[in-house]
């Protein structure tokens, strides 16, 4: 047994003691060992809520109530400022639902998000969220350029961790759907907080020529003035583990790579990464 002052929880507390902000953490090695720090605290979700829209699309498709190949049209009512590529295609652009969903995750496309909320329905998405046991998470609205001050959604570290634990186990909708969604999350571009401290040798296989399936991150982040959130699964040869970090109450509102949430999030992420590898698939001996 580790010294009581040197448990993972206490080491994370020690690592974060200099952070002038609030950071909550949820980690699960998927072998019965969970690390929690404010895991049930509610946060503004920002773009992390998009994981549930993706999950709902696959669930509805599996139930025959939607189609991944349905043709969705970008209309004026879907427009919103912020991240994404669909706006570059112009109004009237038509894409398959699966491609809209991929853009929603990979480049956090806000217009894609509105197109899918329109296609699936707000109530259907929230019913899916409840159905997988994420009882403290809710999508409140679609995105609009004139209401950034209103919450897009509410989420907790534990609920986000539950989503990715189900995904890792192949239990999110179905094994086939879980694999498809995992592949989408693997290509997500904005993962600095979660993956920034993992050696680039593993995260840039095109340059290192390492097996791209050796170690990878499948995740989704979300950030606005009020929060910086990042969570997902980290795949290793010993299996997957789940890590979610959510940060708020910070002074610096700028989107910068040296933001305190990124610096301290990287430290926590690397600590868990090293622990999991050293113990060959566990957080605890």
Regions found by a protein language model. Give the residues of each.
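Mid-domain, small-residue-enriched loop/turn segments at the edges of structured enzyme/sensor domains
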Residues: 19-23, 115-172
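Structured C-terminal helix/loop/strand segments within mature extracytoplasmic catalytic/sensor domains
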Residues: 2-14, 34, 170-192, 196, ...
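Short glycine/serine- and small hydrophobic-enriched flexible loop segments
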Residues: 55-63, 106, 118, 162-169, ...
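A short glycine/serine-rich beta->alpha loop
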Residues: 37-44, 90, 97, 101, ...
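Short, glycine/proline-biased beta-turn/loop segments that scaffold the active-site neighborhood
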Residues: 63-89
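Conserved catalytic neighborhood of penicillin-recognizing serine enzymes
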Residues: 79-114, 153
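Active-site SXXK
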Residues: 44-72, 243
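Beta-lactamase-like hydrolase cores
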Residues: 1-44
